């Protein structure tokens, strides 16, 4: 007889993804239909984007598993922390328009330096190679593709073509930021799945994953 498949966690992850999709729409809807924030720096959409990136970094940074911490976790957490710094550029604008670049570079230097250090280099390469063969990496790659689409889809010249003389910047911003929020939501779900599977100490963890 075949063993009954354990569907608890696949269903949990599917529910999480659906919930995040609904959350993304709800945040945009609150900004546009209820509070009329125009999706500026202080808005439900922007703040949710920042929280999602912070959670992604935290989930990779705190991924459990005795003796399995390697430069890979630092690298992944640093990637999301760098994106968070870029999203928080409004906090640095009073200093200068590009002040966000300095903490961005500092975080990147620490994360990359740790990952390629003599202590972690070999394990980082092995962990990264193994991680790239997991469904979680595919989900992160999908989120990255959606993020690229949001940038292209949000080009002002494109929306001028779509709306002509009726062009309104808010329409462009809503579409761009909404799709960007969805990309971060996909990343958050993937990060959550990674954390849970590491917590369960399943065989696909970065040192041993093969599928």
Residue ranges and their predicted role:
Residues 4-8, 61-71, 121-134:
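Membrane-interface helix-boundary motifs at transmembrane edges
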Residues 9-18, 67-78, 135-140:
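Membrane-interfacial loop-to-transmembrane alpha-helix junctions, especially the N-terminal start
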Residues 17-22, 49-62, 104-119, 178-194:
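Hydrophobic cores of alpha-helical transmembrane segments in multi-pass inner/ER membrane proteins
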Residues 27-37, 85-93, 153-163:
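Juxtamembrane "helix-exit" motif on the non-cytosolic side of transmembrane helices
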Residues 37-48, 167-181:
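Short aromatic-rich membrane-water interface segments that cap or initiate transmembrane helices
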Residues 56-61, 109-130, 141-142, 146-153:
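Alpha-helical transmembrane segments in multipass membrane proteins, preferentially the mid-helix core
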Residues 77-132:
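Membrane-proximal helix-loop-helix units in multi-pass membrane proteins
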Residues 150-161, 175-205:
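C-terminal transmembrane-bundle signature of multipass membrane proteins
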């Amino acid at each position: 007889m075949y063993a009954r498949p354990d569907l608890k966690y696949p269903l949990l992850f599917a529910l999480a993804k659906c919930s995040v999709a609904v959350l993304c729409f709800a945040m945009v809807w609150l900004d546009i239909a209820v509070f009329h924030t125009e999706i500026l720096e202080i808005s439900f959409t922007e703040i949710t984007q920042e929280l999602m990136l912070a959670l992604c970094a935290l989930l990779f940074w705190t991924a459990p598993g005795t003796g399995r911490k390697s430069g890979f976790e630092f690298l992944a957490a640093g990637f999301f922390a760098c994106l968070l710094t870029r999203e928080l550029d409004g906090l640095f604008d009073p200093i200068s328009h590009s002040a966000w670049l300095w903490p961005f570079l500092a975080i990147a230097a620490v994360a990359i330096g740790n990952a390629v250090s003599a202590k972690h280099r070999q394990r980082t390469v092995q962990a990264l190679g193994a991680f790239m063969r997991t469904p979680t990496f595919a989900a992160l790659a999908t989120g990255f593709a959606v993020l690229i689409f949001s940038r292209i889809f949000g080009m002002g010249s494109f929306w001028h073509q779509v709306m002509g003389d009726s062009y309104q910047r808010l329409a462009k911003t809503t579409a761009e930021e909404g799709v960007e929020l969805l990309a971060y939501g996909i990343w958050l779900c993937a990060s959550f799945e990674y954390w849970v599977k590491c917590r369960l100490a399943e065989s696909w963890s970065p040192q041993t994953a093969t599928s």
